[in-house]
C-alpha cells in the first residue's frame, strides 16, 4: 500500500486489486501495475472478455426467446395470451425504468470521472508551475551574479589595486559569488538531467483524452435516454414502425453497453492496481524517462522526516557563502569606501545584488521544500484514485444496467409489436390492467373532460 502522507488506498481499490489476474493460458500473473508487460495486458484483456462472454449469453437468451415466441405463439389460448400481453407491456416499461435509473447513475459517474481527471491535470499544472519557477529563479539569480562578477567586482578590484588587503577581500567575494552561482546551477540541473521534466505536456495529453472520453459517454447516455423515451412513446401510441426501429437500435446499443462494460471493468482493475501502490510505479517511470536522482524523487514522493532533503548541503553552503559576502561587503563599506570614494557606487551595486540574491534564495528554499510538490502529487492521486475510481465504478454499473435493460427490451418489443397488429379489429383481447390500453386511455380522457 502507498505510504504517501495524506493518501491511503480506498477499500474498493483494495477489493479490485485482489481480483485474480489471469493470462490467456489461464495462468495467474502478478497484480502489480505493469501496463508495458504483455502478461499484464493479457490479464486486463481477459477481464474485459468477461463482458464479451456476458454478451454471448445475452444473445443466446434473446435467440432462444425469439424462437420460442415465433414457434409457440399460435398455441396460446385467449386467457394466456391476454395475461402475456400485460406482462410484456409491463416488462418493457420496467426495462425502460431500469435503463433510466442506469442513465442517471451514468451521468453521475461520468461527472465524477471528469472531476477526478480535472484534479489530476490541475495538480500537474501546479507542479509544472513550481518547477518552472525554480528554473527561472535559479537562472535569473545566476545571471545576476555573473553580471556582478564581470562588471562591478572587476571594477572594484581595479580601484583597490594599490591596496592588497582590499584586493584579497574582493577576490574572496568573487569566489563566494561564483560558489553560490555554481551551487544554484547544480540544484537546477537535478530537475533537468537528461530528458526535460515537463508535467504540463502530460497534463495536456490527459486533458485531451479526457475531453473525448467525456464526450463519448455523454453521447452514449443521450442515445440511451432517447431510445427509452421513444420506446415509451411507441408503446403508448402503439406505433408499429417505431417499435421495430427501437428494437433494432436497442440491439446495437446492447452491443455498445457490453463493450463499454468490458472496457470499464479492465480500466477499474488496472486503476486499482496502480492506486494500491502508486509510489513505486511513479518513481520507476519518472526516473526512467527523466533520469532524475532517485533520492530527489523519494524526497518529494514521501516527504517525511525519514527522508533527508537532498538539497540541504548545497543550500547550506550557499547560505554560508552569502553570509560571508555580506560580512566582506560590510568590511569594505566601513574601511575601503572612505579611502576610495569612487568605489562607493560599485559597492552599493554589489550590496543590492546581495539583497536580491538573498530574497531569491529564501524563495528558492521555499519552492524546493517537499510540501508543495508533494501536495500536488497527493492531490493528483486523490483525484485519480478517489473520484476517478468512483466514477468508473458508477459507469460500470450504468453499462451493466443498460445491457440488462436492452436485453429485456429486445426480447419484449417484438411481442409488443405483434400485439399491435390487430388492435383496430378487436379490443376484447386486451387486458383492462394494460397501462397502454387504447380504450382505457380514451375513457380516462372522457372522464377528465367531464370534470
Swiss-Prot record:
A Pfam family reported for this protein in Swiss-Prot or TrEMBL: Tweety
Segments on the Extracellular face: 1-43, 108-214, 262-390
Catalytic activity: chloride(in) = chloride(out); L-glutamate(out) = L-glutamate(in)
Membrane-crossing segments per the record: 44-64, 87-107, 215-235, 241-261, 391-411
Membrane topology, from the record: Multi-pass membrane protein
InterPro entries membership: Tweety (IPR006990)
MF GO annotations: intracellularly calcium-gated chloride channel activity; volume-sensitive chloride channel activity
Cellular compartment(s): Cell membrane
Cytoplasmic side: 65-86, 236-240, 412-451
Glycosylation-annotated residues: 128, 284, 355
Disulfide bonds listed in the record: 275-385, 303-370
One Gene Ontology cellular component: chloride channel complex
Coarse class of the protein's main subcellular location: membrane
A single BP term in Gene Ontology: L-glutamate transmembrane transport
The entry's keywords: Cell membrane, Chloride, Chloride channel, Disulfide bond, Glycoprotein, Ion channel, Ion transport, Membrane, Transmembrane, Transmembrane helix, Transport
Site, as annotated: Essential for the formation of the channel-pore: 163
Described purpose of this protein according to its UniProt entry: May act as a calcium-independent, swelling-dependent volume-regulated anion channel (VRAC-swell) which plays a pivotal role in the process of regulatory volume decrease (RVD) in the brain through the efflux of anions like chloride and organic osmolytes like glutamate.
Assigned protein family: Belongs to the tweety family.
Subunit structure and binding partners: Homotetramer; disulfide-linked. Homodimer.
Official protein name in the record: Protein tweety homolog 1-B
Organism, as annotated: Xenopus laevis (African clawed frog)
Chain's gene name: ttyh1-b
Amino acid at each position: 500500500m502507498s505510504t504517501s502522507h495524506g493518501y491511503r488506498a480506498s477499500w474498493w481499490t483494495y477489493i479490485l486489486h485482489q481480483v485474480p489476474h489471469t493470462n490467456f493460458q489461464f495462468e495467474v500473473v502478478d497484480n502489480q501495475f505493469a501496463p508495458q508487460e504483455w502478461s499484464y495486458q493479457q490479464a486486463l484483456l481477459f477481464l474485459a472478455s468477461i463482458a464479451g462472454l456476458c454478451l454471448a449469453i445475452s444473445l443466446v437468451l434473446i435467440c432462444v426467446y425469439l424462437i420460442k415466441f415465433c414457434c409457440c405463439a399460435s398455441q396460446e389460448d385467449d386467457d394466456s395470451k391476454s395475461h402475456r400481453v400485460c406482462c410484456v407491456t409491463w416488462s418493457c416499461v420496467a426495462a425502460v425504468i431500469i435503463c433510466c435509473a442506469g442513465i442517471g447513475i451514468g451521468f453521475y459517474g461520468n461527472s465524477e470521472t471528469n472531476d477526478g481527471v480535472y484534479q489530476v491535470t490541475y495538480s500537474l499544472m501546479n507542479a509544472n508551475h513550481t518547477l518552472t519557477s525554480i528554473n527561472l529563479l535559479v537562472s535569473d539569480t545566476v545571471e545576476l551574479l555573473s553580471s556582478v562578477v564581470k562588471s562591478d567586482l572587476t571594477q572594484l578590484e581595479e580601484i583597490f589595486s594599490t591596496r592588497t588587503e582590499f584586493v584579497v577581500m574582493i577576490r574572496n567575494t568573487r569566489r563566494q559569488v561564483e560558489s553560490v552561482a555554481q551551487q544554484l546551477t547544480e540544484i537546477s540541473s537535478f530537475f533537468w538531467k537528461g530528458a526535460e521534466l515537463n508535467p504540463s505536456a502530460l497534463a495536456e495529453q490527459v486533458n485531451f483524452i479526457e475531453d473525448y472520453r467525456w464526450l463519448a459517454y455523454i453521447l452514449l447516455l443521450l442515445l440511451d435516454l432517447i431510445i427509452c423515451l421513444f420506446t415509451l412513446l411507441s408503446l403508448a401510441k402503439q406505433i408499429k414502425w417505431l417499435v421495430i426501429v427501437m428494437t433494432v437500435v436497442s440491439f446495437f446499443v446492447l452491443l455498445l453497453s457490453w463493450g463499454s462494460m468490458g472496457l470499464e471493468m479492465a480500466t477499474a482493475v488496472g486503476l486499482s492496481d496502480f492506486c494500491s501502490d502508486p509510489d513505486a510505479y511513479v518513481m520507476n517511470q519518472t526516473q526512467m524517462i527523466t533520469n532524475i536522482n532517485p533520492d530527489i524523487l523519494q524526497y518529494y514522493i514521501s516527504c517525511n522526516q525519514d527522508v533527508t532533503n537532498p538539497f540541504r548541503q548545497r543550500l547550506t553552503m550557499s547560505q554560508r557563502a552569502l553570509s560571508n559576502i555580506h560580512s566582506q561587503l560590510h568590511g569594505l563599506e566601513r574601511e575601503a569606501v572612505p579611502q576610495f570614494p569612487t568605489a562607493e557606487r560599485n559597492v552599493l551595486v554589489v550590496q543590492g545584488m546581495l539583497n536580491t540574491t538573498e530574497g531569491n534564495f529564501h524563495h528558492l528554499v521555499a519552492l524546493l521544500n517537499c510540501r508543495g510538490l508533494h501536495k500536488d502529487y497527493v492531490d493528483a492521486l486523490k483525484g485519480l484514485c478517489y473520484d476517478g475510481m468512483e466514477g468508473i465504478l458508477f459507469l460500470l454499473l450504468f453499462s451493466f444496467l443498460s445491457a440488462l435493460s436492452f436485453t429485456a427490451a429486445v426480447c419484449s418489443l417484438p411481442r409488443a409489436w405483434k400485439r399491435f397488429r390487430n388492435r383496430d379489429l378487436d379490443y376484447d383481447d386486451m387486458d383492462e390492467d394494460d397501462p397502454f390500453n387504447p380504450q382505457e386511455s380514451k375513457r380516462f380522457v372522457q372522464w377528465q373532460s367531464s370534470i
